[in-house]
């Protein structure tokens, strides 16, 4: 779409959780930006082309803050567009696939590549290397708990050079000597400034991690606990009640993120925490090649699972728009629908009817699900593509 072209979305139910707006409105897009919102814009701007979205929900562009999309730097990454614009999601965030030593190459190969249509941002690992080529994941190389992998000076330079796309750190809280302290978490805290730290909650293959109690105590307001709703992570006590450390962390401003993955989201745990008021701040997928065909599938499917556990539709949309933007320090540019903002817009529909959701371990019945129809990314329309599961059917 050139700067001179314009399009009107008409007939949709526009929900902008940031402003509380929920109304049937038209949206005028000119070039890369939203120019106007209101009734009957398709009549006021007859020169604009029209996209009829009657029966659909129109939201700020969805944001998935935990994915793995650095293809070529690990055997488990997915192409960014497969989990991004092709799934109705204009913005995805890679969660720690790269450390400082590889980030420049990954930015050129993935983030800034002309074939990448999705906006890709990144949490980086505080280590120099998290992954190596040929599928040698750090779990196998055992560099995740080797302090020689830390180079604070290099990491500081990379943060400065790539400030436009690095939103914070993703930390696996492994330890070396003292089982109560992760030098990798401490390194991230010393470098992060006002950037958030996303912490991996739970076990880590082949390398020891500090206890959940110590992890939560070390986090700052604005930091993010991903995999917050996994089973056996120390967020519930033996009586099934939220522990004091998780309550205290949330009270001081730590954010809870779903980070579904293959085995890091557990319906019974999530239901209990949500019933007790510990609702996700953000819903993310941790999408990678091992869970794309199931149980995760897509961001819309993951949002549907949270919706089925009690939060309202507005709450679920809020988690992946304004809250996701705020969590990564981009609330000034992303996560809202208003004139002069970049035209990142997601279009969804609700499929009514009994639905069986899977978390990879257990199943749960819901009454409806969200399905992506497509999205605008900076004013360009991308229809949602069939999921691999649908193509195989």
Pin down the residues of each PLM region.
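Histidine-rich, glycine-flanked metal-binding segment
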Residues: 1-59
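Divalent-metal coordination cores built from histidine and acidic residues
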Residues: 81-172
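C-terminal cap of metal-dependent C-N hydrolases
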Residues: 342-392
């Amino acid at each position: 779409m050139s700067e001179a072209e314009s399009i009107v979305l008409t007939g949709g139910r526009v929900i902008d959780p940031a402003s509380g707006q929920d109304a049937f409105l038209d949206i005028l897009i000119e070039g890369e930006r939203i120019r106007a919102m209101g009734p009957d814009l398709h009549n006021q701007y007859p020169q604009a082309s029209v996209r009829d979205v009657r029966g659909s929900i129109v939201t700020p562009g969805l944001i998935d803050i935990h994915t793995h999309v650095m293809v070529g730097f690990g055997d488990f990454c997915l192409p960014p567009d497969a989990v991004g614009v092709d799934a109705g999601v204009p913005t995805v965030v890679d969660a720690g696939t790269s450390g400082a030593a590889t980030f420049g190459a990954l930015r050129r190969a993935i983030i800034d590549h002309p074939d990448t249509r999705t906006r890709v941002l990144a949490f980086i690992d505080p280590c120099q290397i998290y992954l190596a080529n040929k599928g040698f994941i750090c779990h196998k190389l055992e560099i995740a708990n080797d302090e020689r992998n830390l180079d604070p000076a290099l990491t500081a330079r990379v943060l400065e050079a790539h400030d436009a796309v690095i939103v914070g750190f993703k930390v696996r809280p492994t330890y070396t000597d003292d089982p109560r302290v992760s030098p990798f978490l401490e390194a991230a805290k010393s470098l992060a400034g006002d950037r958030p730290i996303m912490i991996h909650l739970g076990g880590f293959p082949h390398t020891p991690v500090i206890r959940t109690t110590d992890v939560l105590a070390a986090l700052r307001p604005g930091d993010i606990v991903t995999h917050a709703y996994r089973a056996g992570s120390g967020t519930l006590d033996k009586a099934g009640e939220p522990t004091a450390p998780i309550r205290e962390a949330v009270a001081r401003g730590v954010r809870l993120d779903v980070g579904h993955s293959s085995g890091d989201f557990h319906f019974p745990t999530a239901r209990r925490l949500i019933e007790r008021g510990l609702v996700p701040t953000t819903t993310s997928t941790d999408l990678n090649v091992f869970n794309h065909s199931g149980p995760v599938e897509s961001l819309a499917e993951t949002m549907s699972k949270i919706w089925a556990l009690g939060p309202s539709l507005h709450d679920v949309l809020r988690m992946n728009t304004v809250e996701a933007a705020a969590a990564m320090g981009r609330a000034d540019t992303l996560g809202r629908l208003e004139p002069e903002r970049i035209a990142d817009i997601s279009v969804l529909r609700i499929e009514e009817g009994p639905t069986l959701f899977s978390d990879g371990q257990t199943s749960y019945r819901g009454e409806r699900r969200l399905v992506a129809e497509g999205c605008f990314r900076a004013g360009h329309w991308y229809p949602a593509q069939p999921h691999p599961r649908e193509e195989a059917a």
